[in-house]
Each structure stands twice: as C-alpha cells, then as structure tokens.
C-alpha cells in the first residue's frame, strides 16, 4: 500500500510522492521558548516524530528541520503586543536571551525524555536575521511589500492565493475577530508585518535598510525552511491553530518571493483538551509537561498521545492517562515474557500483523490502528506461549517486527524493558529528592539565610541540576 497523507491544502488524502526520489524534506514549526513546554507541545512533536520515524523505516532519507522561535512572536500572535520572550524576561528580571536559552534547554530535556528524536537542524530566528532581511528585500523589489515609517508590511491584496490553506478571506478573518493587528499606517487591515521598527527600550533589535528593528513572526519560518530545504519543500507540519494566520502568511510571502509552490503537503495536528475543555492558561487547566513528567512514566505519556490520531483532538484526564499506562504495561509484560521464554515447537506467523501495521501507518500515520495491531499480536503471542511455544525462526521474525514497529516507529518500547522501567522510577525518585531540596532552599531564603540558599543551588549545579527562580516558584532541570 502506498503512503497516503491528508493534505490540509487540498483537504483530501493524497498519495505521497517526494520532490526528489528517496528523499523527504520536512519542516515543523518549533516552540516559542518563553516558558516550559505543555501537553500540546508533546502531542505535536511526538506526532511528527512518528512521521519522521516511519519515513526512515520506509527507506527514505529524511531531512528534518524544526526551528526555535527566540524573537518576533508577539503576544497577540500577529503584529501587535509585546514580544513573548521579552515579556517573560521583564517578569523574571533577566535578559531575553537567557530566557530563550533556558527554556530551549528545558524543551529539549522534555522531548528527550519522551523519546522525541532531535531534528537534523534546529535553527533559531536570531541566528538568521540576514536571511530574513534578504527575503524582505526580495518582496519589496517584486512589489509584494511596502515600507511605512520603518515598518515593512506584506500586501495581502497583491497575492491572489492568500487564504487557500485556511479557506479564510480577508473579510472573513476580520469579521471572525482574528488577532491580525490593525494599524492605521497599513494599506489594508489584513496586511501583516515583515519587519517591525523597534520601540524605545526594545532589547532584541537589529540594523536593517528600513530601521533598527526585528522580524515579524511569520518571516522566520519561510527564511529558514527555504535556506535548509529549498524553495519547495515536501512537508510542512504544525498545530492546526497555526493554519491561520501563521501558515497562511508563510505561503504568501514564500510563493510571492520565489514564484514556486512553497509546500507540497501541509500536515496539521489537532489540539489537546482537558476533561473535554480546551486547554489554556486562562482557563487554569494548563498541563505543564515538566511537572507531568516528574510523576508519570514518559513512555506511558507517549503511548497515551499515540492512541489518538494526530488529526483528532486528544482529551486529557488523569483517568485516561492511568488507563493508557495500564495498557502499555500489559503490552510490555507480553514482550518481557516473549523475550525470556525459550523457543518452543509451535508456530506464529507475524506476516499478517506486519502487513496490517504497514497499512495503518501508510494510511495517514494511523497510530491508533497500528497500536491495535500490536495488541492483537500480543494476544497471539500469549496464546502461543501458553500452548507449544514459538519456534526459533518465528521468534526471530516477531522480534524483528517488534523492533521496527514498537521501538523504531512508535517509540513505545525498547529492547531492554527492564532498564526502561528503572529509568522511569529513577526520575520519580529524583523528583522526590528535589522537592525536599527546593523546600529547604525556600525556607532558607524565607529566613534571609542567603548563604545556605546559594550553597544548595551551587551544590545542585555541580551535580548537573540547574535551579531557576520564577514568579511561580523555583523549578529544576537536568543540564546536558
């Protein structure tokens, strides 16, 4: 069965055909690093991690780019408001780059624990200012952009294809209460910023032909995707909340600059809800990933996420996560039993299961069906082990399939489940110790015993554990 992908642009499943034979170029929007990752990040990056893994298992060479937004993402997600990283730096009374670097380390620490493989390249917006300026110059030269008072805007009316991804026209966007900023200096209210003149006191700023300023949020992804993957890329992924305005603006500025299709297949993962309600800080149901991983097995969380298709919403509850953890443990129990029991005389042909697994993954990366196949195989293995056992040749074939399916593709099991379980328990024990250390440090600071407070911090740092004081309290992370 050929691989079919649901293309958000055409709104249909399409047979995947790479631009270059045997090679897949993938760009996924990375996090804006102004806070710790949340459960929505986990769903998105685990989903695309499995996409990348399956392409590699299918024999493709994958070039995977995932950016880090460390400047330009304003609080209203468009042209107005304060830079999110600068706002956090102001709240924590520190430098914006320190904020970006700290939360970038925190993000990768969480992703590593969830088994999310690193991208080939993880470019940052601040390291690609020249490329972004060059893209703005091209758009100005071609007549798709205009400069006013040191700000440069993309003229939406100049690009006929604007709205083809989200299905939203300019008027529909405005009527629906879109947060695309409205400034009187724009030719049209829907025009979006490519370059912003820095206000007085704005720390993160660069010299440009138009002003000392900073790039618009949408600009960075186009500039970095095209630098590392070319003017047309195979797959662009991200959360469905980025479809408009972010991805719509990416298409407009990229295709206006090159005259070529920007992305061949758009993939969007759905959102996370909590007990049936959309997750959000304002609703006070925000699930902090780092806190969750301090009490939960990372593999169980990964398994929980993959039980839902990437295009389906994921409803989080403690009960649902408990059930997922129990289901994964049953699967692991079968794998441990299978690996420890000697060969027998009975047969178990894994071929039908392997075929069904491939069919599921080739059907728009249908991980729930793929997991169901593993449970069906688990039942068959237990039945065979209860009877005559499994001959060595069939055992080898089953082991090879499990390595491809459970380990290399889904990332929900390893070849050493005992070590896996031990690592999860170790992190839980470390968290309990850290809570005691943080409480001791908090009490010392409360009594103005700063010498003891600093000594605790320095001792932990020497052990590879970094402490950061935030307005919500102290948080810890493992360095490296």
Curated annotation (Swiss-Prot):
Keywords: Aminoacyl-tRNA synthetase, ATP-binding, Cytoplasm, Ligase, Metal-binding, Nucleotide-binding, Protein biosynthesis, Zinc. GO terms for cellular component: cytosol. Gene3D superfamilies: Cysteine-tRNA ligase, C-terminal anti-codon recognition domain, HUPs. Signal peptide: none annotated. NCBIfam families: cysS. The gene is cysS. It comes from the Bacteria. The keyword GTP-binding does not apply. It holds the Pfam family tRNA-synt_1e. It catalyses: tRNA(Cys) + L-cysteine + ATP = L-cysteinyl-tRNA(Cys) + AMP + diphosphate. A motif ('KMSKS' region) lies at residues 278-282. Zn(2+) binds at residues 29, 221, 246, 250. Binds 1 zinc ion per subunit. ATP binds at residue 281. It is found in: Cytoplasm. Monomer. Belongs to the class-I aminoacyl-tRNA synthetase family. Its cofactor is Zn(2+). This is Cysteine--tRNA ligase. The keyword Lipid metabolism does not apply. GO terms for biological process: cysteinyl-tRNA aminoacylation. One of its GO terms (molecular function) is ATP binding. Its EC number is 6.1.1.16. A motif ('HIGH' region) lies at residues 31-41.
